[in-house]
């Protein structure tokens, strides 16, 4: 016979941690996750960003989105020196969508997986798949790999599907969000940058 506590467990929404690369990309993810009945918390964990000023600008915009969309928000400390040592060293000349990016995905999603496990989330996912410039399968591979070590399930949501990027562009205009002109690290500042202004 089901108890009252059993019923509460059955109807409580799944708690999902959304690793947020930036406000514009997250703007397409939060509505989809909420529409699926999930309780969303946004986590800004992006030490790949090349300067503290740019990091803070993007963090503040992501938090502004969280307030607007009514979801919890947290961020991890900025440590670009650690990212350079553990991710970029030896891969400075790797092309975009190459080995350096794969290492970066593992680094940032690894931080998210650890945080999700420490705070009792059912799963974690990422806004990285909104961008048409980010290969979703590479992101998924990184998420699954770190999930094996982190103790929290990875939710492989391809947010660019069902016109996710188009939705993000529309919401950026609606909310006046800052859309950066490059992905984040100094090595992504190339003529064909991986992120464009709306």
Task: Annotate each language-model stretch with its function.
Residues 1-198:
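Nucleotide-activated chemistry modules centered on ATP-dependent adenylation/adenylyltransferase
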């Amino acid at each position: 016979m089901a108890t009252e506590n059993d019923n509460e467990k059955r109807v409580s929404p799944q708690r999902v941690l959304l690793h947020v690369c930036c406000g514009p990309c997250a703007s397409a993810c939060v509505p989809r996750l909420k529409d699926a009945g999930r309780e969303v918390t946004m986590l800004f964990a992006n030490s790949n960003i090349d300067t503290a000023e740019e990091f803070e600008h993007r963090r503040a915009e992501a938090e502004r989105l969280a307030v607007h969309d009514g979801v919890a928000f947290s961020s991890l400390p900025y440590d670009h020196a650690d990212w350079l040592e553990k991710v970029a060293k030896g891969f400075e000349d790797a092309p975009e969508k190459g080995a350096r990016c794969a290492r970066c995905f593992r680094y940032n999603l690894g931080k998210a997986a650890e945080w999700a496990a420490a705070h009792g989330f059912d799963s974690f996912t990422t806004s990285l798949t909104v961008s048409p410039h980010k290969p979703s399968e590479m992101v998924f591979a990184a998420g699954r790999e770190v999930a094996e070590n982190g103790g929290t399930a990875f939710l492989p949501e391809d947010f660019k599907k069902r016109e996710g990027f188009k939705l993000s562009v529309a919401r950026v205009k609606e909310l006046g969000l800052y859309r950066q002109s490059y992905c984040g690290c100094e090595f992504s500042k190339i003529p064909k940058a991986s992120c464009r202004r709306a």
